[in-house]
């Protein structure tokens, strides 16, 4: 009996302590002028609930507090915005104190000069440098021929395989395609070394920044250091060779006729940015497009008709051109609808540089603002039957210009590689649907939060078309 009373007393103390901690944390952030919301536990906030419940957490908070509320997620006090017009304002007004505010682990691993970390003149320099690498002329003369050659060869022989894990294949595809555009002279062992380190880096960017052995963060930092070493060695070799290279690294290192001269560190950060920024969006969009096309035969029929018409105009070995990519209207619609329905990117983070008024509330300096776009993608007032895969909705070009179109970010942070990414996915779909028919091999489950993935892979059986 005595032991039971002790246990009961201990439980009461724990409950009281937890309640007190929750109340204390809520009072810490109950400043006058803040939007409504809850802050969860000290230090951890509501991150656990956010990651565990995902979209349901956001839906519940929206029902309780509206489309603009406070929380404590991703390691810091955060304002969540789900209002389409307000989101556009936030993204369009970096100069008013709404700068990029990505998690510390991402900034540490991607580098202090990466395009997501800098703003003002530094951002203009890095963005200008990146845009010069993927201009229409560069796309036409250099990038697209390399992408086409890579996709044509990468997709060969899949019908000889018992099963194809599309998730694994598209991840490797996105990474290898980018790496070969950056440094086309790399040998296979060098490519494998980059690949091994890069996949560790990706995991590290989405980890808690605890720098102790065994953590994903430590592994990510070490992977970034190893990639820096590999890049430094490659850049030194190129400097000593005196040769001219026409890949992205060659243009970044070019001293003559280069408006955007970067330091060696800025070049390394730019290379990692190029590898990282397109990796998940290109790979996941490619995988999910095949999933939706499999489930919607009419959409697949329309897409295949578009690509077969292009092939009929060409010799068997003739590559895709930029004009071909531009002519793929339905393919572009499939890519947009896949990005919307799967919500490849859940939102965008901003940070306040000073106390500022927003939506009638006073947001303190240093708080993050999470422009949460997932709910907007499924808003019935914006999209008819939003839970249905309907690429035809995007054939109306004006939909891309709507204020709530944030699939690629917005404002000065609009994804600079948008058209390059679309070209890569379009090329992948072109060669896949003209080479193969496919069926799902098993009942693989897909997760949609915190990132779209197939925990055990997404397996297909391919046969010749």
UniProtKB/Swiss-Prot annotation:
Pathway: Plant hormone biosynthesis; brassinosteroid biosynthesis. Expressed in stems, hypocotyls, leaves, siliques, shoots, and roots, with a higher expression in apical shoots. Pfam families: p450. Induction: Repressed by brassinolide (BL) treatment. Induced rapidly and transiently in seedlings hooks, petioles and cotyledons but fades out of hypocotyls after exposure to light. It catalyses: 6-deoxoteasterone + reduced [NADPH--hemoprotein reductase] + O2 = 6alpha-hydroxyteasterone + oxidized [NADPH--hemoprotein reductase] + H2O + H(+); 6alpha-hydroxytyphasterol + reduced [NADPH--hemoprotein reductase] + O2 = teasterone + oxidized [NADPH--hemoprotein reductase] + 2 H2O + H(+); 3-dehydro-6-deoxoteasterone + reduced [NADPH--hemoprotein reductase] + O2 = 3-dehydro-6alpha-hydroxyteasterone + oxidized [NADPH--hemoprotein reductase] + H2O + H(+); 3-dehydro-6alpha-hydroxyteasterone + reduced [NADPH--hemoprotein reductase] + O2 = 3-dehydroteasterone + oxidized [NADPH--hemoprotein reductase] + 2 H2O + H(+). A lipid is attached at residue 462 (S-farnesyl cysteine). Keywords: Brassinosteroid biosynthesis, Endoplasmic reticulum, Heme, Iron, Lipid biosynthesis, Lipid metabolism, Lipoprotein, Membrane, Metal-binding, Monooxygenase, Oxidoreductase, Prenylation, Steroid biosynthesis, Transmembrane, Transmembrane helix. This is Cytochrome P450 85A2. The lineage of its organism: Eukaryota, Viridiplantae, Streptophyta, Embryophyta, Tracheophyta. The gene is CYP85A2.
